[in-house]
Structures are given as structure tokens and as C-alpha cells.
UniProtKB/Swiss-Prot annotation:
Keyword Chaperone: yes
A single GO BP: chaperone cofactor-dependent protein refolding
Taxonomic lineage from the root: Bacteria, Pseudomonadati, Pseudomonadota, Alphaproteobacteria, Rickettsiales
Species assigned in the record: Anaplasma phagocytophilum (strain HZ)
The protein's name in its UniProt record: Co-chaperonin GroES
Xref: SUPFAM superfamilies: GroES-like
Amino acid sequence: MNLAMLHDNVLVEALEDSNPNSPIQLPDSAKKKPTKGKVVSVGPGASNSDGKVTPMSVKVGDCVYYRQWAGNEIEFDGKKFIVMKESDIIAKEA
């Protein structure tokens, strides 16, 4: 991945919670936005009032859960990602 995040931004690839074998298929407009994803890129962290960088608590490869309407969707190299602030991440799998 050649997309470097700045500050306390995190690039996440959403993981769909769909079951293609289910007899009930919802149209895209009726599906909930995913809230689970894999961290693909992480910025160095936010600067505090003293100018020191607060390190990030997530790293590339982490599986995270985030707020439903977190971040902004982008497309890079033909794939869709979500760029969000670290504070939009509410949990990570241990």
C-alpha cells in the first residue's frame, strides 16, 4: 500500500458481514454500513499542545470496530477504503 496516512488518520478496509448463501438478499440501499474492518495504513499520531506526537493505539493488520458513520470513503488502486480518525475506532480484536 503506497498511501501514507497523516496525523491521527487510519485507513481501513471494510469487512462485509454478508452471507451470500442466504435466501434473503437485500438491495445495497437497505444494507447497513459495515462497522468492522482491517487497518491498512496508520498515521504517526496527533500532536498535543506541546507539539509532541501521541502514538497510535492501532497498527496495520489490526481488526477494528468503528462507529457506523465514521470517516470518509475513498477509492485507491481500484479498491474502496474508509479514512477515519483514530477516535472513531471503538474497539480492536485482541
